[in-house]
Amino acid sequence: MRWIKVMAGLLPMIGSKGADEKDSSQQRRLSRVVVPEHYDLHVKILDAGFCGSVGIRVMISQDVSEIVLNAKELEIRDAGIVVEGARIPGRVVVGEAEKELEVVRIVFPSSLRAGPGYLTMEFCGDYNNGLVGLYKSGGPKEVYSTHFEPTDARWVFPCFDQPDMKATFKISIDAGSKFTVLANTQAIPSLREEYGDRKIEYFEETCKMSTYLVAFVVGELSYIEDWSKDGVRLRVYGDSSEVEWGRYGLEVGKRCLEYFSEYFGVGYEFPRAGSAKIDMVGIPNFSSGAMENWGLITFRRESLLYVPGKSNVEDMKNVAETVCHELGHMWFGNLVTMSWWDDLWLNEGFATWVSFKGMENIGSVVSWDVWGEFVLWNVVRGMVDDGLGKSHQIRMNVTDPGEIGEIFDSISYCKGASVIRMIERYVGESVFMLGIRRYIKEHMYGNGNAMSLWKAIGEEYGEDISEMVEGWISQAGYPVVSVQDCGSSLVLSQSRYSMLGKSDDSLWTIPVVVSWEGKGQERIELRGRETTVRKRSSVYKVNAEYGGFYRVLYDSAGLSGLESRIDSLSVVDRVNVIEDVFGLGFGLYGGLEHGLRRISEYYSDSYHVARSGIEKLLRLRSVFYDDAEIVSLIDKKVRKMILPCVGRIDVFDIGTSVESVSMNKYVLSVGVEVGIREAVEKVQELWRRHVEAGEELGELRWIVYKAVVDENLGYMMDKYKNGDTPGMRREVMNGFSGIKREENFLDVVGNLSQFSVEDIGVVIGSISRGGAFRDAMVEYVVSHGEELYLMVHKNAMLYNMIIMSLRHVSGDLIVEKVERFLSGIKHSGSNLSIEKVRNEIQWRRRMRGIREEVLRGLLPEAEK
């Protein structure tokens, strides 16, 4: 499942009781006394809800008196089991204890003997309003679709809803004749049944797979298609008015599938060679970025559809990354699945990393600095979130429904991907690839875990790497490596990094790579608290190419030498210097005043370097948002840095490459934010030409919206509802951060129900990040918390987006209100989000305590 960059239901050991088993109702995981081998699943799509039947071929390993499986808010009847040709009826038990555990008990009149059986039952349910299970999407034409990850298949049919209980599936869907019906595998036309205005589609049997990957979609859909060189059919499905917008995603998908088939050493053959297919469907309402259902990938529309000439470069990047991410899951997640959700990071971290590997290797359809993007959106983000106090380890023990959804976060995705990249650089690309191939071939159609992966890579590397890697995934946080220049040698020492001043005795085996000027690179393993290395040149950079997930604290000699060569550093190395200097300054390790004085020298017209540097100043601006003096000084410094670039920008011809477009857009947006008159005038002129002559806003749409929202809120709401690109809704919501009129603020927050359920948290977050109504937005959330929880239909991930909007405040009074609100939240699945908000606010208040140091760093020398 792809996380959206604006970014997250679940399990107690319960099981079928044998004669000698103790009651295990207080445990969350199903026992393995009864395991599924095959499902025959039939679902009938009706206007008001759905009904169906399921037959499950099971293997019983010991005598049992009941079978326990997962179900949630389903009406279940006519349960029974066929054993040795005779059907034994079962009594359906769903009491309060079962509801709490999200299970159903099928109790039999006498014990069932160990051996095979065929469990059957019928069920009915309602469509889910929370974008999980089986739900209806709005729009001109309704679409019925499923979303089962992590534990939401149980909303739709009784099942053994755990990733380690794989089985094959035969699916049939009864729906209206006008609908296209899709499932994981191809439909079998010769088996189609038609009656009245309805039809039943039967689908080929799947390979063994987990329940969370089962999917079906029903709607009035059209498609475009292509074929990979290995004969895999790829299609993009969507509304007939939009499906042509899938051409870019289709091309990316085809090329990426071909590359991954080579990289993994195993071709894509789901469900089998000769009938392998991948359908990609844009769903009108969707909570995440996409979902990797095997053979039937579902997407948020803007993560799949790209409109040439109207969509922007961010849309293009998003489509490419999301498609590659989901295709990576076809091997890592689907073909080989984590045994349990504590290794979720292995699915998501790997898919995140390999999506960039894919984009790097699919030719001209991706024409930007892929690894520069990776560093900004994964390494940097992972370090910021993991450095804030009570983070969690990458591999986190989860049991409760609610906990699993919470770990779909930046630690699992961003840090997980960054650690995988670090390991690849440590053992080498070819060795790492061979290890991955070994792991996949050993666990195909089954389950694996992190230890199995390290073992496979270690066998190719010729050395056990598990001890080194385990330290990175089994403990929270990451190290800061201090570098002391002793003349002829360097002393490297490690301690845990913390933005809150809370260190501990954690130790990592750190694969340090040092780049020596004129001498190449040297690999060093820092295993203990410190080590000494011979100095090879006077200028050096520790953590070459930003390959490791750690910060580097240089002494004055080391940093001075590095700064003297700043212009010769690669983009990612230059970003690394900025991130370390300010990351350590923000953690009060010292050097913030120095960094603020030198930031203009670190800056360059490279998009990734410019963004890294400016974002540090804007983050400080956000901390001191109610301090007019600090805000004024930051704005002045930013204006001086970007003014030359702003002057060169032509808003009617924003750039000729993805790099130049990204840079010009970013600088222009910041210029408007900090009040550069020329930037504001250019944006206003583009808006005037748009209104008077129909000039396309194009790449600058959201920047223009932010600048003109107060005078044009009605226009923007119309674009939200009737936009002509899939990404326009997001651009409108980003534009809300520019609201400065109280009546507009009240209009938006007073009518949140007009937004799609998945967008409510995005709207709130956009306004809370803006300057004018930051505190007011937070006041609204803390006074309407329960109402908002119901508004997003108790979807924990969507509600957590709302909770996270509270982290942008610093003042005493508003912080007290936030804390009272957080203390009162009792809903399952928000504990990690609550801690993240508390930690962010604690850091902000800690930073406000060093105001004088910040002031000294911002003031010109003559004024100090």
From Swiss-Prot:
CC annotations in GO: cytoplasm; extracellular space; membrane
Positions annotated to bind substrate = 149, 289-293
UniProt cross-references to Pfam families, sorted A to Z: ERAP1_C, Peptidase_M1, Peptidase_M1_N
So where does Zn(2+) get bound? 325, 329, 348
SUPFAM superfamilies reported for this sequence:
Leukotriene A4 hydrolase N-terminal domain, Metalloproteases ('zincins'), catalytic domain
Active site at 326 (proton acceptor)
Q: Which InterPro entries match?
A: Aminopeptidase_N-like_N, Aminopeptidase_N-like_N_sf, ERAP1-like_C_dom, M1_APN-typ, Peptidase_M1, Peptidase_M1_aminopeptidases, Peptidase_M1_dom, Peptidase_M4/M1_CTD_sf
- UniProt EC number: 3.4.11.-
What biological process terms from GO does the record include? peptide catabolic process; proteolysis
Q: Which organism is it from?
A: Encephalitozoon cuniculi (strain GB-M1) (Microsporidian parasite)
* GO MF: metalloaminopeptidase activity; peptide binding; zinc ion binding
What protein name is recorded for this chain?
Answer: Probable M1 family aminopeptidase 2
- Report the family membership: Belongs to the peptidase M1 family.
Question: Does Metal-binding appear among the keywords?
Answer: yes
Its top-level enzyme class, in one word, is hydrolase
- The protein's site described by Transition state stabilizer is found at 413
Q: Which cofactor does it need?
A: Zn(2+)
This entry's comment on the bound cofactor is: Binds 1 zinc ion per subunit.
Q: Which UniProt keywords apply?
A: Aminopeptidase, Hydrolase, Metal-binding, Metalloprotease, Protease, Zinc
